[in-house]
Amino acid sequence: MEKKKAFIPLLYLASIVFLPWWISLSFNKSLESWVTNWWNTGQSENFLNDIQEKSIIKKVLELEELFLLDEMLKEYPETHLQKLRIAISKETIQLIKMHNEDRIHTILHFSTNIICFVILSGYSILGNEELVILNSWVQEFLYNLSDTIKAFSILLLTDLCIGFHSPHGWELMIGSVYKDFGFSHNDQIISSLVSTFPVILDTIFKYWIFRYLNRVSPSLVVIYHSLND
């Protein structure tokens, strides 16, 4: 009976780890055809207009060089110009297809992540008992560690997440999340998040040390500051 009680929280933990991957894969496959059909039938005419406008303007500017080249080659034979116009038309069609695929990808991934978040939230609420058991295990494990190990672990974790060498890791992680939601890479937004988010975390962590650890374990705070210095 005790083994069964211990097995259920472990099974719940494993399901939390693998459930997001399974949900994402399943809904991506099932929603792909529906989103593609919805987008291509014109029902999305007014959807994401601002984003589309910027994207299309950028692509049109890229094509301007080809049109300028067309003007420069007017002195060439008509057959040569005809081939050039055909090539430009094909390139334009290809850009439109790529634009549609990007928009479909954005909508699909954003919808999938929202659905995944809702399902996981409901799953966490329904599994509240298992979460309580897992939390008690974690607290017992941390309680049995010495203050030195705790301080070393906190220092290692903070240096990895909010240390002076962490921006590259944050850039990769935020870029990965940004891509997972289906948005195209944007250096300005990612740089802004990288420069602000770790600072916010660092402030919260220092406040936590000041308010919580000073009250619960003063010796741990002393060891932490000694290692940090």
From Swiss-Prot:
It is found in: Plastid, Chloroplast inner membrane. One of its GO terms (cellular component) is chloroplast inner membrane. The chain crosses the membrane at residues 7-27, 114-134, 154-174, 189-209. It holds the Pfam family CemA. One of its GO terms (molecular function) is antiporter activity. The keyword Ion transport applies. It catalyses: K(+)(in) + H(+)(out) = K(+)(out) + H(+)(in). GO terms for biological process: potassium ion transport. Keywords: Antiport, Chloroplast, Hydrogen ion transport, Ion transport, Membrane, Plastid, Plastid inner membrane, Potassium, Potassium transport, Transmembrane, Transmembrane helix, Transport. It is a multi-pass membrane protein. It comes from the Eukaryota. Belongs to the CemA family. HAMAP family: CemA_PxcA (MF_01308). Contributes to K(+)/H(+) antiport activity by supporting proton efflux to control proton extrusion and homeostasis in chloroplasts in a light-dependent manner to modulate photosynthesis. Prevents excessive induction of non-photochemical quenching (NPQ) under continuous-light conditions. Indirectly promotes efficient inorganic carbon uptake into chloroplasts. This is Potassium/proton antiporter CemA.
